[in-house]
Amino acid sequence: MKLKAAAVVSCDFGKGKLYPQVMGAGWNESGENRAASSAQLVGWPPVRTFRKNLSTPKPADADDLMNKMKPCSDEGHGSRDAAQERRPSSTMFVKVNLEGYAVGRKIDLKAHRSYDSLSQALQSMFHGFLSDGIATRDNELQRMEEGSKKRYVLVYEDNEGDRMLVGDVPWDGREAGSGRRPAAGVDQVSERPDVSPAMATTPAATVAVTQRRELTNLAATVAAHVLVFLASGQGHINCMMHFAMGDIVELLESLGTNGSLVKGD
């Protein structure tokens, strides 16, 4: 029986060490590898390099890839701006301020389906907003439910910065079918739309909220031009930001009221 490999123990007398040396078909007596000049063995079991190259997929040529690429007809394809434009917005927030106060709130117009829903949300948001109205908040809420004359006048700023009474534009942006028209008096404010979707197109859309209380006869005068806060149970007008007290008195005198206030029904 012929052995192809044998283990020979060599002794190095100079260093006094023993070490094994494997000899076989690929080794000669001097310990040199006869297969060093042949192809390199790869993996286990040993596979010739050229055989392994046959199983490796050839990388695609760059020219072939360029030929397969087709230009996109959609301009701006892949850009972040174009993706944001195609993505529908789920919210539409506008800033709401109580007249005379820097602190504001925001409300989502898309969370409401009608002006009535939005009007109720705004009234609940700003009711008792002032610290002096917190104590009587529950009583005032009850009076509002019973049909009190307490109302809110809502305006918005157009593109030119002018404050406009809302309600001319229907909720869905199309021609109004309900036949509503802007009311001349503050008493009818609750009967008309409160916030127009056109506010959202204004760069700095602001809704100014003015509170009207029972003691007033300024409905037709104040509705479109003057934003005032009428103190309930008191005989004076606290005008906010726009007109001085003297201007209001002159305006009342020109209307024949002689500057006096007549308590509403």
Curated annotation (Swiss-Prot):
The lineage of its organism: Eukaryota, Viridiplantae, Streptophyta, Embryophyta, Tracheophyta. Highly expressed in flowers. Expressed in roots and seedlings. It comes from the Eukaryota. It comes from Oryza sativa subsp. japonica. Aux/IAA proteins are short-lived transcriptional factors that function as repressors of early auxin response genes at low auxin concentrations. Homodimers and heterodimers. Residues 91-194 form the PB1 domain. Belongs to the Aux/IAA family. This is Auxin-responsive protein IAA22. Residues 54-88, 172-199 are annotated as: Disordered. Residues 65-88 have a biased composition (Basic and acidic residues).
